[in-house]
């Protein structure tokens, strides 16, 4: 059987960077990793309406820097920065009290070409009982207008309320998953419908990049 590797992890340090950047001793590593998970879960649950694309976490000795890429920065920042202050207060309950918290909010330039937001759009449409073929077609058309070079969408589960679960996918353009220099964006989402959960997977091909693997002098 064919084995599938995660498209983003497969391209780390080639076209993708790590979403968490820090170093910890073996003693503190589990605690730091648990903090990262809690931070990401907080953003996922409490900022779900902000159109979050990705969250990057950078740590220094006494500072945690959170970079949030979003399509709606106003929801996160709030009036006069009140939203940022609320997030910081909530995060202080999660992370080490001695660490300073810094939050940067980056607005996405091309919303319709982002795999996370495309998957989120399809999931929302499915939850509104829109037929899966119509939802995927709308998402693909929006991505094509955003000038992506290729897109693939897969929806799995009891499609349109069918008795037997199945998977269906649609692809437009090129999506070269075996080419390491290909700039592939990938995301998964779940849609809660009256017939159960539907899984949504989205691959977006944004062209090829020249690999920039860092050289390490020995």
UniProtKB/Swiss-Prot annotation:
The protein's assembly and partners: Part of the 30S ribosomal subunit.
Protein name: Small ribosomal subunit protein uS3c
Family annotation (SUPFAM superfamilies): Prokaryotic type KH domain (KH-domain type II), Ribosomal protein S3 C-terminal domain
Gene for this chain: rps3
Keywords from the UniProt entry: Chloroplast, Plastid, Ribonucleoprotein, Ribosomal protein, RNA-binding, rRNA-binding
Pfam family, one: Ribosomal_S3_C
GO molecular function: rRNA binding; structural constituent of ribosome
Gene Ontology CC: chloroplast; cytosolic small ribosomal subunit
Top-level lineage group: Eukaryota
Family under the similarity heading: Belongs to the universal ribosomal protein uS3 family.
Sequence ranges assigned to domain KH type-2 in this UniProt record: 39-109
Annotated transmembrane regions: none
Keyword field contains Ribonucleoprotein: yes
Subcellular location: Plastid, Chloroplast
């Amino acid at each position: 059987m064919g084995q599938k590797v995660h498209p983003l992890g497969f391209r780390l340090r080639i076209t993708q960077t790590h979403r968490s950047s820090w170093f910890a001793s073996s003693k503190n590593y589990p605690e730091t990793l648990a903090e990262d998970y809690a931070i990401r879960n907080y953003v996922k649950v409490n900022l779900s309406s902000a159109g979050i694309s990705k969250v990057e976490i950078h740590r220094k000795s006494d500072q945690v820097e959170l970079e949030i890429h979003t399509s709606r920065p106003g929801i996160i920042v709030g009036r006069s920065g009140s939203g940022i202050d609320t997030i910081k207060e909530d995060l202080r309950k999660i992370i080490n009290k001695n660490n300073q918290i810094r939050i940067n909010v980056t607005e996405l330039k091309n919303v319709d070409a982002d795999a996370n937001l495309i998957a989120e759009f399809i999931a929302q449409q499915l939850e509104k009982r829109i037929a899966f073929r119509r939802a995927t077609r709308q998402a693909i058309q929006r991505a094509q207008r955003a000038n992506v070079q290729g897109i693939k969408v897969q929806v799995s589960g009891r499609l349109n309320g069918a008795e037997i679960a199945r998977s269906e996918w649609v692809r437009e353009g090129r999506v070269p998953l075996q080419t390491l220099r290909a700039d592939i964006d990938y995301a998964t989402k779940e849609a809660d419908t009256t017939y159960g959960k539907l899984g949504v997977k989205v691959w977006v091909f944004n062209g090829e990049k020249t690999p920039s693997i860092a050289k390490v002098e020995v």
